[in-house]
Amino acid sequence: MASGWGITGNKGRCYDFWMDFSECMSHCREPKDCTLLREDYLECLHHSKEFQRRNRIYKEEQRKLRAASRKGEETGDGTHTHH
């Protein structure tokens, strides 16, 4: 990451985040002052927040589909016969 070159020969996608974080760390008194910049850099590298959000959306969609299918099964066509 130190060189700034990505695999395609251009600037790496997270290089700007790294430079901001690195500059903050070299000038700050407390490392916690750079926490937000660190989070931005790590999110750029790993996309963990994005994946968590996508997973929550997927689970909610699946929950709604299950609820709709259960509701459809319960209402059915209204002709429940017991023998």
Swiss-Prot record:
<keyword id="KW-0496">Mitochondrion</keyword>
<feature type="disulfide bond">
    <location>
        <begin position="14"/>
        <end position="44"/>
    </location>
</feature>
<keyword id="KW-0249">Electron transport</keyword>
<dbReference type="GO" id="GO:0005829">
    <property type="term" value="C:cytosol"/>
</dbReference>
<dbReference type="GO" id="GO:0005739">
    <property type="term" value="C:mitochondrion"/>
</dbReference>
<keyword id="KW-1015">Disulfide bond</keyword>
<dbReference type="GO" id="GO:0005743">
    <property type="term" value="C:mitochondrial inner membrane"/>
</dbReference>
<feature type="short sequence motif" description="Cx9C motif 2">
    <location>
        <begin position="34"/>
        <end position="44"/>
    </location>
</feature>
<feature type="domain" description="CHCH">
    <location>
        <begin position="11"/>
        <end position="52"/>
    </location>
</feature>
<comment type="subunit">
    <text>Complex I is composed of at least 49 different subunits. This is a component of the iron-sulfur (IP) fragment of the enzyme.</text>
</comment>
<keyword id="KW-0679">Respiratory chain</keyword>
<feature type="short sequence motif" description="Cx9C motif 1">
    <location>
        <begin position="14"/>
        <end position="24"/>
    </location>
</feature>
<keyword id="KW-0813">Transport</keyword>
<feature type="disulfide bond">
    <location>
        <begin position="24"/>
        <end position="34"/>
    </location>
</feature>
<feature type="region of interest" description="Disordered">
    <location>
        <begin position="62"/>
        <end position="83"/>
    </location>
</feature>
<keyword id="KW-0999">Mitochondrion inner membrane</keyword>
<protein>
    <recommendedName>
        <fullName>NADH dehydrogenase [ubiquinone] iron-sulfur protein 5-B</fullName>
    </recommendedName>
</protein>
<comment type="similarity">
    <text>Belongs to the complex I NDUFS5 subunit family.</text>
</comment>
<dbReference type="InterPro" id="IPR019342">
    <property type="entry name" value="NADH_UbQ_OxRdtase_FeS-su5"/>
</dbReference>
<dbReference type="GO" id="GO:0005758">
    <property type="term" value="C:mitochondrial intermembrane space"/>
</dbReference>
<dbReference type="Pfam" id="PF10200">
    <property type="entry name" value="Ndufs5"/>
</dbReference>
<keyword id="KW-0472">Membrane</keyword>
<comment type="function">
    <text>Accessory subunit of the mitochondrial membrane respiratory chain NADH dehydrogenase (Complex I), that is believed not to be involved in catalysis. Complex I functions in the transfer of electrons from NADH to the respiratory chain. The immediate electron acceptor for the enzyme is believed to be ubiquinone.</text>
</comment>
